Regions:
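Transmembrane beta-barrel strand/turn architecture of Gram-negative outer membrane proteins
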Residues: 41-59
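Residues on the lipid-exposed face of transmembrane beta-strands in outer-membrane beta-barrel proteins
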Residues: 3-9, 49-53, 106-110, 121, ...
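Transmembrane beta-strands of outer-membrane beta-barrel proteins
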Residues: 16-20, 47, 61-63, 117-119, ...
Length: 166
């Protein structure tokens, strides 16, 4: 189930867009060989925001924020313990949350009939990435998952296009 609400505004040289998406996901797992089952539900709000400014008829500046979600799959959520190796057991975590990746970017663009330039700077980060971790309890290696991952990324890009035809 999903719903989206958005708003767009333009005033002279300034433009903007804002949006928010709501997503509800329900997972239900039944095992054929066992009398076991579990379910998981996710409710996520996913915002986006963009501002633009027309510097000149052929030049613009844009800044934006976006969020992306990655929901955990059944394997990550499955609470039942795999004991096929009694010295190293594994199980999922039904309390996992959706992983949320945030992205901020600024872009300058200039274009003409002969030459196009785009310069972008992007910063993205995740504070609750789904990661596997292990620990020893009572002499047994336990492996499971949690929202403990963190990452940051900075990206600079330059795009040049030259039209060589007369």
């Amino acid at each position: 189930l999903a719903a989206y609400l958005g708003y767009q505004l333009k005033y002279k040289k300034l433009g903007g867009k804002a949006g928010i998406r709501y997503e509800h996901t329900f997972m239900d797992a039944d095992y054929k060989n066992k009398d076991e089952k579990f379910d998981a539900q996710f409710d996520d709000l996913v915002p986006s925001l963009m501002f633009s400014y027309q510097l000149a008829p052929t030049q613009s500046l844009r800044a934006s924020y976006n969020m992306r979600i990655s929901r955990p799959g059944i394997w990550f959520l499955n609470p039942f313990t795999d004991t096929s190796n009694p010295t190293a057991i594994s199980y999922g975590n039904p309390d996992l949350e959706s992983e949320k990746a945030h992205s901020l970017s600024v872009t300058f663009g200039s274009f003409s009939q002969k030459f196009n330039v785009n310069v972008s700077a992007n910063y993205s980060f995740v504070n609750n990435g789904i990661e596997q971790y292990s620990f020893i309890k009572d002499g047994v290696m336990n492996s499971t998952y949690d929202n403990i991952g963190k990452s940051k990324n900075i990206n600079l890009s330059l795009f040049l296009n030259w039209n060589m035809s007369p």
